[in-house]
Amino acid sequence: MKEYQPQKIESKWQKRWQDEISYETEVDHNKDKYYVLEMFPYPSGKLHMGHMRVYSIGDVLARFQRMRGYNVLHPMGWDAFGLPAENAAIENQDLPSRWTYANIDNMKDQLQALGTSYDWKREVSTCSPDYYKWTQWMFLQLYKNGLAYKKKAPVNWCPECETVLANEQVENGACWRCDSMVEQKQLSQWFFKITEYADRLDQDLELLEEWPDRVKTMQKNWIGKSQGTEIDFPVKGSREKIRAFTTRPDTIFGATYMVLAPEHPMTEQLVQGTDQEKEVMDFIKGVHEMGKEAREAEDLEKEGVFTGRWAINPLNGEEIPILVGNYVLMEYGTGAIMAVPAHDQRDFQFAHKYNLPIKEVVTPPEGEGKTESETHDELKKAYTDHGILINSPGYNGMTSEQAIEQITRDIENKGIGAGVTTYRLRDWLVSRQRYWGAPIPVLYCDQCGILPVPEDELPVQLPEDVDFSQGSRNVLAARQDFVETSCPQCGGSAQRETDTMDTFVCSSWYFLRYTTPWDNEVPFRQEDVNYWMPVDQYIGGIEHAVLHLLYARFFTKVMYDQGYTNFKEPFSRLLAQGMVNKDGAKMSKSKGNVVSPDEILRTYGADTGRLFILFAAPPEKDLDWNDEGVEGCYRFLQRLYRLVNDNQNLVDLQLDDTKFTKEDKEYHRLIHKTIKKVTDDISERHNFNTAISAIMELTNASSKYKEQKEVNESLLRTGLETIVMLLAPFTPHIAEELWETLGYQDSVHKLNWPSYDEKAMVAEEAEMVVQVNGKVRDHLTVPADSSEETIKEKALEREKVQKYISGAEIKKVIVIPQKLVNIVCK
């Protein structure tokens, strides 16, 4: 008996696909297109199970849509810049490029071993000068249109390494490499003005009907559109004013103190030369050491310090203390809040901690007419809903909605503030004081100032022979041959920018480059990009729900506005796949629960690995790795392999359903029902697990059918061929092998996807459950087209049913055609 040998079969078909360039994309703009794209990986050197899952999902869709006749674009590339390569270079005294390209080679071999159908002719690598030339071109387009600018911003600075650290490189306030305490330092940095697009990025989420709601909600929250009012509070004894932002101007009479963010420009000014200066500056230093993430945490212990200064409430003239607090961030609003502890829970907790006044100015609607504030002891928590105003001269008795409108109007008329729309979103800081990134294409000339590098001089290339012996200091700044250049405007000496770009910039447009990756004259050809885009199906982890997807949407809108493309959104449909867990926890080396794709391929083969990972859970849910489940998938493929090999010589005649026996009809019906289910599950719902389950059921039914005395060989052949075609997107190697076993020369992946016949799915008979008062008492087989009256009669005649209804009063008989009869009696 011929045994299933997956490794032998898989290497055979992978070689053939490679030799025949089977998956090169057809350039035919007249065909209907389907662009399926998985988020490209960082070339760490090894695929993990999360990779295997996402690339298996994408490959199923690519193979399925090819068989349905679409012109499919299914490319792959490498998000290849970033810190790990630079760190490896420092540790191993190697070049980041050599480390990166070695990893790419290894991961490419692994991807091909999975049986993926990528068009490798379109492969891109973001660290290649051919690619980052166009990343730099993108920067210049933003710069020309006022969307790239430079300003000072705080960074994490390691005084020992003399370099800027990313947030993730700061561990408990110390440098991850040398353990020195990290300082906050103001550096001049490049930003992209993504805030110019905040409203469109927010509004256009409505266009993304086939994105998961949770992803859209995460983006909406990150953009953080908020309607509110900015109000100027004069500083007592000064001509200065502090502008505060609030979404609840109706509570202004309840403001009992102000809180500034430690980064607020007035903080130092307020305490300079005062008794409070040292205490406040020490507090600010401590807050900076916490890091931004800790300050944004829900369970943050809210702390503050008094500046010794007072602000004046512009509507009632009350003096309120000005504090600096760790829970106020410069990124939100104006970096200053009017604190209303009676109506904001954070302010309430802070006021209790520092014994600050609490004054109620809004009461629930049913409390209308109440005029006296509750005491500290009476108010157990802040009342944060809208209500009726009290203790607010000139506004008492108004609803919150009325007061918000009126107070904002009055503030505007007095010239002490305005109604505003604000966003949580801040401009995108793209400068990185690192070597392994795309150089920012800017020059500095003493005579001419800041100048963009001329487009015909792109790319500004990274020097290859760099020295990392000094650790993580800015390598580019130390290279005079890189820094020193001439000014394109005056011809004098100039210096290059030594910062490189955030790696998110490279991944914000790669999906456009895939449409024309070999063209060195343009980043993409308009006729190609407008044909292929937007991506029909984008697939990637939920961890990219905000930043990557938001930046990609931003770049797409910029390209649209500048006339380079004709689409406003990059991804029509998004699938955020779940994690792969083992023993109830995410796979990780530290937990010792990692299963390597290489290990699965060696033991069971790629088809088994793919089948299990697609069968074990719906793609958007977390998947729990299960060795028994993998074994089960392997045994299924073994059974199928034997079934087809044992029946490879079946006759292939035209089917004549007029001669079908009852068993033939049932088997024929199941074939067509399976085609419909698998088609719908893949295309509409992406329920690969239920599609595979249906194929397994048809396989089991085929095994049973062939054991009958009278077998219609042509029908059995049809069933086996259908199974092989339906499995082809999931398990591409064994499908090719079995198709060849059945006597065909062409690739199974070049076939048309099987179609189903609605008529063939209609059963001649229906087996129905018969209930009496909701309890199952019998089963009934009737012709499928029986009328309700006929079904009622037959059900009531049943001997088993008579036993329960004899002598009873029948109230009604409920019939659900072809499924159920329920007799209700008393």
From Swiss-Prot:
Gene Ontology molecular-function annotations = aminoacyl-tRNA deacylase activity; ATP binding; leucine-tRNA ligase activity
Output the CDD domains linked to this UniProt entry: Anticodon_Ia_Leu_BEm, LeuRS_core
Q: EC no.?
A: 6.1.1.4
Q: Which UniProt keywords apply?
A: Aminoacyl-tRNA synthetase, ATP-binding, Cytoplasm, Ligase, Nucleotide-binding, Protein biosynthesis
**What enzyme category does the UniProt record give?**
ligase
Where on this chain does ATP bind? K589
- Name the catalysed reactions: tRNA(Leu) + L-leucine + ATP = L-leucyl-tRNA(Leu) + AMP + diphosphate
InterPro entries annotated for this entry?
aa-tRNA-synth_I_CS, aa-tRNA-synth_Ia, Leu-tRNA-ligase, Leu_tRNA-synth_edit, M/V/L/I-tRNA-synth_anticd-bd, Methionyl/Leucyl_tRNA_Synth, Rossmann-like_a/b/a_fold, tRNAsynth_Ia_anticodon-bd
This entry carries the following GO cellular component terms, namely: cytosol
Q: Which domain of life is it from?
A: Bacteria
Sequence similarity: Belongs to the class-I aminoacyl-tRNA synthetase family.
Q: What is this protein called?
A: Leucine--tRNA ligase
